[in-house]
Regions:
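Transmembrane alpha-helical segments of multi-pass transport proteins
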Residues: 88, 111, 359-363, 374-375, ...
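Interfacial/gating helices of multi-pass transporter permease domains
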Residues: 9, 14-41, 61, 110-111, ...
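Membrane-water interface segments that mark the loop-to-transmembrane alpha-helix transition
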Residues: 1-11, 33, 42-96, 107-117, ...
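Interhelical loop/hinge segments that connect adjacent transmembrane helices in multipass membrane
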Residues: 98-102, 183-224, 264-282, 401-417
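Signature of the first transmembrane helix
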Residues: 1-47, 79, 83-94, 115, ...
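Helix-loop junctions and terminal segments of transmembrane helices
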Residues: 44-65, 134-135, 246, 250-288, ...
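Alpha-helical transmembrane segments of multi-pass membrane transport and lipid-handling proteins
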Residues: 12, 69-100, 110-115, 155-159, ...
């Protein structure tokens, strides 16, 4: 957890420095490039990592090498898909289909897509030793590699931004991070080296496990990444850049804690199901409790301090990011159901994850456009924040079906929100009083 805290601190520091070196428009462009790249990645997600982690043959070199080969092909396909999108955008702009101030009409977007997503080819060569470490819950070296790679990439990005004041500095930093991470994984992690190999039996096993992962990823990515897709057509690059800063602050904690529960809960659930399946409910509720409390308390805390925090950290160009942070903090109330997803995958029920994401997708595309047309951009922000409430009835249904549900747990954990809000409000009041006293 402390290591992921270090990664969180690095992201915050880089955000603070880069917003002083680049204009808001740069962050809007990169936000959309990242969104398209993530969509392409998740649309080709056949659950390679999950299949290896949960397989009874997860240490078999034939399975690992087959997974590595599939991963390389997938990385190339992601990049080619993004190149096709770039060509389509360039052509649409040339013939006059994309005009005005919308982000899609930017002349920089196509080349940024081509070069900005090249790192997906690099990460395709990532060692499957990472999967073995996940399976054995041996995370120390993996986390150190991630922190070191991120640090080197951030330093590279800042140096290039300082010299050029260009959005390309962000692209270069991401590429350096990917190269460092892949090389270090092959060199420093324990395990046999990978080689190109294709075992038809294991390939079928991965595809069979991953068909529901793929369906789930399709729905998940269209919902979770849909905010920038929609906003990109509604607002200017500068407004989307400010939104991206606020969203980044709201998601830093979610992603850091999300990484912890992905790395910890999946192997833990698989282990208990292999050795003591009767303890699954006990382990599930015990693992959910700390994550629920962290997410819900953080939601209340960020809601209280959002505008004050952004005003403290960023220059006036990004002031509206404080309102974005305050609104999007509400999304943390629903992030806790990621633990449920890990449990369903361990129970060999990836279809449950697919139905969860179907509910998320339907909720998103019914609420967000309607809220935008009724209440403007602010209404869209609120809909983006709370649309995930649509997954709750589905999660409760599957929890009951698998014998994991507890009304008491669901109700009592919500009491953490006012605690977080009170702490945040007290912090803002104390800081304001102190600042006035100093003046």
């Amino acid at each position: 957890v402390s290591a992921y805290g270090g990664m969180l601190a690095l992201r915050l520091a880089s955000s603070l420095i880069m917003t002083r070196l680049l204009a808001p428009e740069a962050f809007g462009l990169i936000a959309l490039v990242t969104t398209i790249s993530v969509i392409a990645a998740l649309l080709s997600d056949v659950g390679i990592r999950e299949a290896v982690v949960h397989s009874d043959h997860g240490d078999d070199p034939r399975l690992l090498n087959t997974a590595w080969t599939m991963q390389i092909v997938r990385g190339l396909l992601i990049w080619l898909a993004c190149c096709l999108v770039a060509i389509a955008l360039f052509t649409a702009r040339k013939i006059g289909w994309l005009v005005g101030d919308s982000l899609y009409a930017s002349a920089l977007l196509p080349p940024l897509l081509v070069l900005g997503t090249l790192s997906s080819v690099v990460t395709g060569f990532e060692s499957t030793k990472r999967y073995t470490a996940d399976r054995r819950i041996e995370q120390k070296r993996v986390v150190l590699i991630e922190i070191s790679s991120m640090f080197i990439g951030i330093v590279s990005m800042i140096v290039i931004a300082r010299l050029t004041s260009s959005v390309w500095s962000i692209v270069a930093g991401g590429f350096v991070t990917s190269v460092c991470s892949v090389v270090a994984g092959h060199v420093w992690l324990h395990g046999a080296p990978n080689r190109l190999q294709w075992d038809a039996m294991y390939a079928r096993q991965i595809f069979r496990y991953g068909k529901w992962i793929l369906a789930s990823s399709l729905m998940y990515v269209l919902a979770v990444q849909g905010d920038k897709l929609l906003l990109g057509g509604w607002v200017t690059p500068a407004i989307l850049g400010v939104y991206a800063i606020g969203q980044n602050l709201a998601q830093i904690l979610e992603q850091a804690i999300g990484r912890v529960f992905t790395q910890v809960t999946a192997p833990a659930f698989s282990d208990v199901l292999r050795n003591s399946p009767q303890r699954m409910r006990e382990v599930y509720l015990r693992l959910r409790l700390p994550f629920d409390l962290i997410f819900i308390t953080s939601a209340g805390f960020l809601f209280a301090i959002g505008p004050w925090l952004v005003g403290l950290m960023y220059d006036p160009r990004y002031a509206q990011a404080g309102t974005v942070l305050q609104i999007l903090s509400c999304a943390l109330l629903f992030s806790r159901y990621g633990v449920s997803t890990s449990a369903y995958l361990a129970l060999q029920a990836p279809h449950a994850q697919a139905f969860l994401n179907m509910a998320r997708l339907l909720s998103f595309y019914s609420l967000v456009p309607l809220s935008y047309h009724l209440f403007g951009v602010q209404g869209a922000y609120w809909a983006i924040a709370v649309h995930a409430a649509g997954i709750m009835p589905v999660a409760w249904y599957y929890d009951r079906r698998f014998g994991l549900f507890s009304w008491r747990h669901e109700a009592l954990s919500l009491g953490a929100w006012p605690v977080g809000w009170l702490v945040g409000s007290a912090l803002v009041a104390a800081a304001t009083t102190l600042a006035q006293g100093i003046r």
